[in-house]
Every structure is written in structure tokens, then in C-alpha cells.
Design a protein with these regions (language model features):
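Generic anion/oxyanion-binding catalytic loop in active/binding sites
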Residues: 16, 71, 113, 218, ...
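Internal alpha/beta core interface subdomains
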Residues: 1-20
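Glycine-rich, flexible loop/turn motifs
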Residues: 15-18, 54-60, 215-220
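Conserved, hydrophobic alpha-helical core segments of structured domains
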Residues: 21-195
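Charged substrate- and nucleic-acid-binding regions of tRNA-handling and nucleotidyl-transfer enzymes
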Residues: 1, 130-134, 189-276
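Short linear loop/turn motifs
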Residues: 11, 57-66, 145-147, 237-249
């Protein structure tokens, strides 16, 4: 591929302040091209101060020592390795770039000198939303990236029930994106802590099984509906609450997605509630 001459690279750095005069939409268009192109991590690694003109939030990550045995890289280098490890999809690479943006704000060191970043997914999601709004990113891209950032540090679902609930919450596309992000995030950690790859493989296999079986993970797929609930005397919020309880039981494997079984369970739960 092409490389930038040293004198050109110096000129880019010297002139970076001029980016402040360019329309946010134009910068966003170029950022999308960068993120989905070849070697985005290498470009970002070389020019963080240039990107920092319109996204100054990234600068505290550069050289930030995580002081944690799970991490052999500073926050910025960890981030770049995660970016390089996800497929070239705008939402995924954005999420990889911004998933730890809030870590410097959340850093705390314990008595043993170990670093912790409690609450960093929520802080990173908040900051990512602000940053993407600043460049007037498309709503669908912004919301997908922010959701992935918010979810990126949650435990990988290890059971059929866990994957079913995640599928219900995120949908297939974003759950697959989340697993890809978690895979990249784990690969960017210290080598001794990369065993999560097998858990991700297992979650993906369960997801494939659920989709192949057309497993019930939504109210639309449930064998009973709101009319069935009103026919047995439920009304108002109680209808939705009962349907949600039945759906959860089906996803957990406690009930089959069978109309008669669900109606029997609903009647039993209604009677139990009356007796309380």
C-alpha cells in the first residue's frame, strides 16, 4: 500500500488546526472511509493529535497505563488493536474505537496498585453519543455503536437461556456484532487472558442453534397473545406483564412454546396472584 512521506506527515500535523474550519458532516464522511478502509489502526496510531482536533476525548487514552494484569497495552494501543481485530463495518469499528473512551475518567487505583475502571461502559457510551452527535453521524449508526459500547463489558452468555435473552434484547445483527467486539476486545488484552475466545465460540454456536430452530425469543413468536390474556380476564398492564413472564419462561426452558401449556401456566399464575 501507499505510505505518507515524512515531510507530508509533518505538514498534516502542523495544519491539523484547520480541521476546525471543516463542516462536521465532511469530517464524518472521511472518518467512515478511514475506519472501514485498510489499516485504520495504523493511521490512528500515527495521527492521534489530528483526530483529537475534532475528537479531543481520545487524547487522554494515549499512553494511559491501565495498571492491570489483564492489560499489557495502554488504553490507546489496546483500542487500536481492537479496531484492527473487528470486521470492516462502520458500527463495529466505531464501537471498537470508542468502547474504552471513558476509561481515563473512571480510573481508580486500589491499595495494591491495581487499576480499575468501574462504570466505564456507561461513561464510554455517554461520551460516544456526544462525539458522534458532534460529527452529525447518522442516527442508526450512532445508536448501534453506542449500544455496543454500553454492552461490551457484560458477561458473555454461556447458556441457551442467556443467549436467548441477549438475542431478544439486541436482535441477531447486533448480538453478532457484540460477540465480534468482545472477541476483538479480548484479543487486545494480555496473552494470558485470551481464553474468552472459546466462550465466544460457544455463544455463537448457541445463537446459530436458536436461529436454525426458530426458537421463541419475542412476543410475536409466542404461541399466545394479548387477546388470549384478556379472554381469561386480564386487563391493562397485567396483559403485557403476563406475556412477558410467559416469554421469559419459554426462553429459560421452563415452559414449551405451546398454546395450551402457556394458557394453563397463565391461569395458574393468575390464580396464585389472586390468592396473595
Amino acid at each position: 500500500g501507499f505510505s505518507i512521506r515524512p515531510d507530508t506527515a509533518s505538514a498534516i500535523r502542523r495544519s491539523r488546526a484547520l480541521l476546525a474550519d471543516i463542516a462536521p458532516e465532511r469530517i464524518w464522511t472521511e472518518m467512515k472511509k478511514l475506519l472501514t478502509g485498510e489499516r485504520p489502526a495504523a493511521v490512528l496510531r500515527e495521527y492521534p493529535e489530528v483526530v483529537g482536533v475534532f475528537w479531543p476525548e481520545i487524547l487522554p487514552m494515549v499512553g494511559f497505563d491501565q495498571k492491570n494484569r489483564h492489560h499489557c497495552y495502554d488504553v490507546w494501543e489496546h483500542t487500536l488493536r481492537a479496531v484492527a481485530a473487528v470486521p470492516p463495518e462502520t458500527e463495529l469499528r466505531l464501537a471498537a474505537l470508542l468502547h474504552d473512551i471513558g476509561k481515563p475518567n473512571c480510573f481508580a487505583e486500589d491499595a495494591a496498585g491495581c487499576g480499575h475502571f468501574r462504570g466505564h461502559p456507561a461513561e464510554s457510551a455517554r461520551m460516544a453519543d456526544v462525539m458522534l452527535r458532534r460529527l452529525r453521524a447518522e442516527t442508526v449508526i450512532r445508536e448501534a455503536a453506542v449500544t455496543l459500547v454500553m454492552w461490551h463489558d457484560r458477561n458473555i452468555p454461556r447458556t441457551r437461556s442467556g443467549v436467548a435473552h441477549a438475542l431478544r434484547d439486541l436482535g441477531e445483527r447486533d448480538l453478532r456484532r457484540l460477540l465480534a467486539l468482545k472477541r476483538a476486545d479480548n484479543l487486545a488484552q494480555a496473552p494470558a487472558f485470551r481464553s474468552m475466545q472459546k466462550e465466544i465460540d460457544r455463544a455463537e454456536a448457541i445463537l446459530d442453534e436458536l436461529l436454525t430452530e426458530s426458537a421463541c425469543v419475542s412476543l410475536k413468536q409466542l404461541a399466545v397473545n394479548g387477546k388470549d390474556m384478556t379472554d381469561m380476564g386480564l386487563s391493562g398492564p397485567a396483559v403485557g406483564e403476563m406475556l412477558e413472564r410467559l416469554l421469559s419462561a419459554v426462553m429459560d426452558g421452563a415452559l414449551p412454546n405451546d398454546r395450551e401449556a402457556l394458557l394453563t401456566a397463565a391461569r395458574g399464575r393468575r390464580e396464585t396472584a389472586r390468592d396473595l
